[in-house]
Amino acid sequence: MTLTNPFIQSALERIDSPEVIGVGIVGSYARGQEMKYSDVDFDIFVSRLPEDPYDRYTLRYWDDKLISLKYTLFDDERAALTNPRRAIWAVPGLRQMKTVLDKDGSMAALQKAAHEFDWSLLQPAADEFAAEEVMGNAEEVHKILSGLAREHESTVLYATWWLVKNMLEAVAVQRGLMIISENRYFDLIQDSVGRDSAWTRAFRTAWGLDPNSSQYQARGAAALTVYCLTASMFDKLIPEKHRKVVDKTLQLIKDAEI
């Protein structure tokens, strides 16, 4: 981390208050991977959030650096370690964090908990989340099918965005992928599923990463393929209460012959 002590101390003087429990630097500066345009991310752990919601996350320019200030309830961050959807982000973030203020040892204890984190305890909840996402996104499939049938570009693109975004998260959470950086999110998921897999090829087309996927029809069709392959990936996790919705949705995709 190349930030100078005077800079850090100056920042802490502006940040500190009676509600602050501790402060950590996260992101590229914590990992030693900062570049020319990197901002400095301060996670500020507090006992009470600022009253104005806009003050809970804000940006500033200090000493010619873009500063990100994110206020988080300390107890809420600890609770994130028990939620699979949040843990894939919280655990690596806490492990990498460089603590610059720890008033009572709470920050050290939180980082220790992150280093001792056991994903296996959350796997059942992660499986349930993935199954719920497959079921819940049947609505987006219907929207894509409707948009394609009506040749309505905006409908297809909006539903494609939501469907693919949610299938990505389902895979990341179910597989317990530790997101070491938001810049690696798409890389980590594609690497996990397989760069040459049908799922990844469909994702890249749906997301517009394929040079031949500029047309909304191709992207919508690829998003439907992502859904089918994700449903197949998690087939054994889908409970009976969701089976009819998922199976009917898969049949609609098949019948559409897109």
Stretch-by-stretch model annotation:
Residues 1-38, 43-94:
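Metal-dependent nucleotidyltransferase catalytic core
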Residues 3-4, 58-152:
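Conserved NTP/Mg2+-binding pocket subregion across the NTase superfamily
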Residues 4-13, 101-111, 239-252:
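Short N-terminal helix-initiation segments at or just after the protein's N-terminus
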Residues 4-5, 14-17, 49-52, 63, ...:
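Serine/threonine-rich low-complexity intrinsically disordered regions
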Residues 20-22, 110-113, 167-171:
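Conserved short hydrophobic patches within well-ordered secondary structure
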Residues 32, 56, 97, 227-235:
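Glycine-centered flexibility motif
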